[in-house]
């Protein structure tokens, strides 16, 4: 029995090509786009990419997660000191999820290059999720933030964490909040080491959650203007709280706030 003939996808009308692309998972689309300049240009022309979501994670290993129309693809970049493993790829399927591991000497650099290509193919300027543990790649935090500043117009939901209390990430936190635009949600779960910590807090968020908010005193609270505000471990006194509530009720301050929780 002779092998099947290659399917001439590029000879199809564009609408038919687009239907073929809709049946592909995001990795298949990216792999197709890498074949030639022509396939790359065709890959960038699809009209349904607005339904795709792109998420970035920097925890134990950097990750790019792509939510397609049917499948969710996660690409992990795993640091390796084994020369034989450098560049190797492992893929596993689990239901709707496709897990892709890429072994690299410099996972952050590879993660950046792969992300730029993903953004180009799917014609994205903003990303849906950024989740970052600031104590994982401390020496590269500034480089990562500068990269995001140059390549991402905005982030819809951002979560920042600190796993090692002994590592001071105050400056990195402030630098990220000064340079990355956050549209909808900010979750901040880190320890504060400096009394003068005073980062920019985005305005008009749908939700602001700060789990160690000792640095947010009364005057700073008056500046917060988000729809839902949750502040844990907060030092505001009962007297200040009562004054704030009175101002809030008569709409003298924080007019966008609909829900406020202090602990």
Question: Whereabouts are the PLM-identified features?
Answer:
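Non-core capping and flanking segments associated with repeat-based/extracellular domains
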Residues: 1-263
